[in-house]
Amino acid sequence: MSWDELRSTAVQVRAPQPIGTRGKLLIAGDHLFLSEPGKGVHVFDNTDPKAPRAVMFIQIPGNVDIAVREGHLYADSFVDLLVFELDLPNRSAKLLHRLEDQYAYDPYQTLATDTAVHVEGIDKTKGVVVRLEPVQSNAKVAQ
């Protein structure tokens, strides 16, 4: 994904989505925030703790960490820090600010695999690695 795409169109507030890999869980007021590493943040209305209701999904590629304070969600997106203004009664979140290049880039961050992999030819200037596309290689591996 190019840097332009990541920073202009990739972050979106969407309807609730199915939960994949579970990450960090935060409670703020009557809401729960569940990160899905690499994907974004699921937001739940927790007015009734016995039956939390999904209210929205904030799509944030490369997300790993989140914090919530005084009506704001702070989240990383690969190398950037994002600040959202939360309007939970209206089930919305607005990206207020993006602090670019706050973290070191890790090209392996979103590559969930149990197998050791080496990715060649990563050009950080072109964007971020969001998935693996296996290719056939005849190269011999040193033992």
Question: Model regions: which residues?
Answer:
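Feature marking well-ordered beta-strand scaffolds used for ligand recognition
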Residues: 1-143
